[in-house]
Amino acid sequence: MPAIQSPSGKILQLEMENFKSYKGHQLVGPFKDFTAIIGPNGSGKSNLMDAISFVLGVRTGQLRGSQLKDLIYAFDDRDKEQRGRKAFVRLVYQMDDGVELRFTRSITSAGGSEYRIDNRVVNLDEYNGKLRSLGILVKARNFLVFQGDVESIASKNPKELTGLLEEISGSEELKKEYEGLEEKKASAEEKAALIYQKKKTIGNEKKLKKAQKEEAEKHLRLQEELKALKRERFLWQLYNIENDIEKANEDVDSEKSNRKDVMRELEKFEREAGKRKVEQAKYLKEIAQREKKIAEKSSKLGKIQPELLRFKEEIARIKAKIETNRKDVDKRKKEKGKHSKEIEQMQKSIKELNKKMELFNKKRQDSSGKLPMLDSQLQDYFRLKEEAGMKTIKLRDEHEVLERQRRTDLEALRNLEENYQQLINRKNDLDEQIKRFKDRQGEIETSSSKYKNETTSLKTELRALQEKHVNAREASAKLKTRIAELEDQLSDLTAERYENERDSRLTQAVESLKRLFQGVHGRMTDLCRPNRKKYNLAVTVAMGRFMDAVVVEDENTGKDCIKYLKEQRLPPMTFIPLQSVRVKQVFERLRNLGGTAKLVFDVIQFDPELEKAVLYAVGNTLVCDELEEAKVLSWSGERFKVVTVDGILLTKAGTMTGGTSGGMEAKSNKWDDKKIEGLKKNKEDFEQQLENIGSIREMQMKESEISGKISGLEKKIQYAEIEKKSIKDKLPQLEQEERNIIEEIDRIKPELSKARTEVDKRKTEMNKLEKRMNEIVDRIYKDFSQSVGVPNIRVYEETQLKTAEKEAEERLELSNQLAKLKYQLEYEQNRDVGSRIRKIESSISSLETDLEGIQKTMSERKETAVKITNEINNWKKEMEECKQKSEEYEKEILDWKKQASQATTSITKLNRQIHSKETQIEQLISQKQEITEKCELEHITLPVLSDAMEEDDSDGPQFDFSELGRAYLQERRPSAREKVEAEFRQKIESKTSEIERTAPNLRALDQYEAIQEKEKQVSQEFEAARKEEKQVADAFNTVKQKRYELFMEAFNHIASNIDKIYKQLTKSNTHPLGGTAYLNLENEDDPFLHGIKYTTMPPTKRFRDMEQLSGGEKTVAALALLFSIHSYRPSPFFILDEVDAALDNLNVAKVAKFIRSKSCQAARDNQDAEDGNGFQSIVISLKDSFYDKAEALVGVYRDTERSCSSTMSFDLRNYQES
């Protein structure tokens, strides 16, 4: 196949203004033969590709935007809302001869597109035409591969590949025409076949009509004879019916006169009863008013009772609280008295110690403690003492130091012992408080738990009672509503309805028949009913004597029933056998007459198996709402038998029977008998359910009582929780204080022990120094001691020293006792025992104030309750008096009603007699109507004495019976009439049987001539259809061949190139031959209607489906197909968006090498199909192993200062490897 030459030229540069993420005017380029667009994600690379696609005419929907305004740069939503925003993209295209073309597409302020070529405004068709002349096919997108297109092509099924190839080849443009002609061809073929079949059918029909023509004449002759026989029979029947109607009317007039007298008496009785009812109503009204007031006050009393219970609980709780507080005050007062006594005792002890201290000081001052001594001896003593002092000065200094240290240690020891004792006392107090709080906490827990259990139990009981109350109230309301509804329905249904003895006997008789004979269905009144109550009277009149007819399965069952009635001497009944009864078909046109007219048959509800019986009873009788409409239907144009909803009957013969009698109304009320019994039973059931529900008032009282108890318990729990929380808050503080004191005691104990050790140590050291000092002094005072007669000088001084030491110890003891008592007195005085007593007494005062308020409110509520109770009792008393008066009037009303009932019974009896006669008359009239209807239906004209449209007092026109023979005009018994009827029936059946045996087509003559003409027309139609079929088939084959050629041209080109391209993409040093790829058609006759199988085999791998290839292998296969398709419809440039995304580095290098080989100037100059066509490549890529093969780079980056995308270009040709 000759190579398809690629158009020359390339994209030189791109200008943009406010397009997508590119703000203001920006210039991109120049673009080289192989240009790579790079940049980080989100920088705007794809927007640059969208700009090239936009200027080349690609639709907005493919550019990630729903409308053109979405493509205009906008920093935020405020920018988007600004009016007058514009944008444009201009592409500078350079031809091989250096001529530049400028394609510009702008977005106007109105949101539309404007196209320019070299700054000249053109329309879209001219714009696309110019692009097409350069090899740029916008619709086929042969110059563009969007991001994701490679994956999309790799995942296409065979049918989708066919669609892609159709789009590329252009055969898709013929698809609509192809399918339209294909449909026309099938339609033309079907039409020709139908006309041929029609022609064949008409030929067969022509033979049949010829035979039917001869049979028709004989049949018409027999029909005329049958019509004359029926006319004579109908005249004889009408003659007998009119005589019977005249006798029955005389009897009815007599009975009606008697009924009128009795009705006057009934009116009198009812009038008297009405007067008594008016008087009784006054008392009943008074009773209702009293009941309403009692209910209102009872409701108010019901609200007060729970309040009284709640007040009672509150009073008990407050009293208990006051009692507890008083006991606590008494206890604390005792403690206060004890505390005061302790303070007095301490103050007394302090005074005594102070006195002892004063006496001790005075005694010490008075006592000198010295022994008598001579003056010379005294001088020697002082001299020696001075000498001893000089020799022991150093030791005395050390002794004084130790003495001072010992006094300091003793002072510290006394302080530690005092602190220790204070801490021990405070710890004991805290232990006592903590124990008291914990005991109280236990008591509160026990009582609170008890109250909670009682509350839970009462709440459970209350919920159950409330649920029962709500359910009872809802059930009571529903039952009362249902009972009221049933009473209304019963009132409507039973108004003016009285039991009929004859109907009762008939009902019992029918029940017996149903029990004895299997084929008895029941009476018409039991088996069907009007679908709406307003049609009751109309259906009753339309059915006439058949309303009480009994429906049986067959004639034998009917005969057995008649025999049983005769044996039991029961009233006669009419029977309708379903199997043998003959009915007229419903005329469908009568259902579409308009207005309120309907078929009586359509307003009756019945079981489908009883359809024949109902149709036999009512026929094609119509029902409508108004008399005027009935007259129009019955007497204008085609005549119909019509009955109004008021019971007025209009016949085809022109007669009109109107007015309603008691008998007719009672008869129409039979439709409601079953419903009334059901309603009565339902009412009794509902009343029993209402009685079983119980008293709602008692439930309310009990509910209020339990609510009051719960409220009291919840208050107790609330107060317990408050006290519990107070203890819970204080207890940790006391325990923490105790822990702190214990820690302090533990800290002081070692210090106390250490202090005592230090004191003892100082004492030992001092004793050692004193011993050394004594030895020195003894040597010095040796001679002096002998002279004064003492072993040593200390004997002289000991008396004074011991006395001093003893005095010092006594003084220390007194000081310690005094300090201890002062500290204890200060501690006890700081304990404010009275504040707690004052606080509790204040609480008691507040509680007593609350108690007085609640007791006062409770007293007011009690007074209100007593007042309401007295009012209720007074009203009950008045209500009882009204009830007595009402009962007296009720007795009088019952007496008058009893007399009215007797009159009503008489009227009912007379009504039954009148009804019996009227029923007889109605049956006779119905029979007469049926006869006239049969005559009209069978087109039999009866002789009349006057015009058929004239009316008189009789039931229909006056027939002329003069044509009857004298034998037929004689009065006969029923048995004789039956015999004559049997003779007529035998003659008619014989004639009918003869007619039925012929069964000709009476329209055969006319049909025979018509079918001859029809045969001629069909032959002409068949020839025209064949001609049309040939024309459509020729047009279809032409389009099919053109579509086939376009498709196969593209397929053959792509199939022949794909293997070469795939080998170039997959070959390597290891596998120099590369892989294998080929395309196969699933159907070679109609390839565009079926799929294309694309198969690839990568190097070293066996054949496998495309779905089983790896992601990279699929991408390489898809690229091979894309490049093959491009070679068929080559564009001067090829723009690819991240086609290397799924490729590994090795495949990236291969694809880059391939694109470079096709993009270099040499490849573009050498347009050879063997190696594929050269083209300019613009590729978006994120992989450096790909874009480092390009001749130029266009870098896209995000300009953060301007909040837009910007570009920069870099020429790589100077850095390419040779």
From Swiss-Prot:
Record-level Gene Ontology MF annotations: ATP binding; ATP hydrolysis activity
Motif (Nuclear localization signal 1): 183-190
Locus of motif Nuclear localization signal 2: 425-432
SMART domains attached to this UniProt entry: SMC_hinge
Disruption phenotype: Altered chromosome dynamics and cell division during seed development, leading to aberrant mitoses and giant polyploid nuclei in endosperm as well as arrested embryos with a few small cells.
Binding residues annotated for ATP, in chain numbering: 39-46
UniProt-listed SUPFAM superfamilies: P-loop containing nucleoside triphosphate hydrolases, Smc hinge domain
Reported tissue expression: Mostly expressed in flower buds and stems, and, to a lower extent, in leaves and roots.
Coiled coil (residue ranges): 159-505, 671-938, 1003-1035
Keywords, comma-separated and alphabetical: ATP-binding, Cell cycle, Cell division, Chromosome, Coiled coil, DNA damage, DNA repair, Meiosis, Mitosis, Nucleotide-binding, Nucleus, Repeat
InterPro entries: P-loop_NTPase, RecF/RecN/SMC_N, SMC, Smc1_ABC, SMC_hinge, SMC_hinge_sf
One of the GO BP terms on file: cell division
A cellular component term, taken from the record's GO annotations: cohesin complex
Limits of the Zinc-hook domain: 11-1200
Domain SMC hinge: 518-632
UniProt-annotated location(s): Nucleus; Chromosome
Function: Central component of cohesin, a complex required for chromosome cohesion during the cell cycle. The cohesin complex may form a large proteinaceous ring within which sister chromatids can be trapped. At anaphase, the complex is cleaved and dissociates from chromatin, allowing sister chromatids to segregate. Cohesion is coupled to DNA replication and is involved in DNA repair. The cohesin complex also plays an important role in spindle pole assembly during mitosis and in chromosomes movement. Essential protein plant viability. Required for chromosome segregation (e.g.
Complex and partners: Cohesin complexes are composed of the SMC1 and SMC3 heterodimer attached via their SMC hinge domain, SCC3, and an alpha-kleisin subunit SCC1 linked to one SYN subunit (SYN1, SYN2, SYN3 or SYN4).
Domain notes from UniProt: The flexible SMC hinge domain, which separates the large intramolecular coiled coil regions, allows the heterotypic interaction with the corresponding domain of SMC1A or SMC1B, forming a V-shaped heterodimer. The two heads of the heterodimer are then connected by different ends of the cleavable RAD21 protein, forming a ring structure.
Family in the record: Belongs to the SMC family. SMC1 subfamily.
Name of this chain's protein: Structural maintenance of chromosomes protein 1
Gene that encodes it: SMC1
